[in-house]
Amino acid sequence: MTPTLTLSQLEYGHQSALFAPLNLHCQPGEIWAVLGANGRGKSTLLDTITGVLPALAGSVKASGGVGIVPQSFRPAFGWRVKEVVLMGRARHIALFAQPQKEDERQVLDALAQLNIADLAETLFSTLSGGQQQLVMIARALVGASQNILLDEPCSALDLGNQQTVLQLISDLSHNQSRTVMFTTHDPTHALQVASHTLLLMPGNQWLAGPTPEVVQEENLRHAYGVQVRRLQLEGYPSPVVTPLFSIRRPAT
C-alpha cells in the first residue's frame, strides 16, 4: 500500500529544528495522534505539513490533498456558518463560478453529520468556541481531501462533543479510508481512536509507532514530567490514562 502522507528526514521549527529528523509513512485508513507537552511543536508540525511554515530540511509528500482544521479561525467578514463551510469546497469550484447544488448538499450533509445543521444560517462570529470548532471540522470534510489534519480538535469541546468528534475521526478512517492526523494533550484520546502515535519528547527526541506500544506509562512520564497510570476499565475496549498528582491545600 502506498502512503498518502510521507515525512522524510523532516526537520521543522521557526528558526532551528525542534527535533531529530522525522520519518513517518502514513497509510490510507491510519489515524495518527501527535502527543506532547505545551510548546513541544505539535501545531508547528501541522503548519509544516500544510506548507504554512517551510521545512528546514527534508520533505513532506501528500497524495490526494490535505484538509486542515485549525485551533481557531477568524473570518474577515460577517460570514454565516454555511458560507464558512463552503470555503472547504473551493478546489472543487471553478474560479468566479457560483456554487452548484452538489456543493450546497455537501455543506448541509457535513453540518448534519456533526449535529449542527440548525446553525447553517447563524453568523460564525456569534458561535461558542466549541461550535466554531465543529464548523471548521465540517469545512475540512466537504473538501474531500485524502489527508485530514486536526489541531487540538477537542480542546474547546464538552465531553459529549468530544465523543462526537472522536467518533467522526474513527469513521473517516474506517468508513472512508482517509488518513487522519490530530494533535492532542490527552493520551486517552490517542488510545481510543489512533492506530499510531507520534510522541514528542524532551531533548529533541520523538517516538512513533502503534499507539499501544508508544502510549506507555514510562514514555508519558518522560514526555509530560508527571507520573501517570494507564488503566484498563472493565467493559471498555480502550485503556484510559490518569495523572497521579495531588494538589496541596493549606492546613486547617
What are these model-predicted stretches?
Residues 197-210:
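H-loop (His-switch) and adjacent beta-strand-loop-beta switch element
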Residues 223-252:
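ABC ATPase nucleotide-binding domains
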Residues 35-37:
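The feature captures the beta-strand-to-loop junction immediately N-terminal to the Walker
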Residues 123-127, 131:
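Conserved ABC ATPase signature
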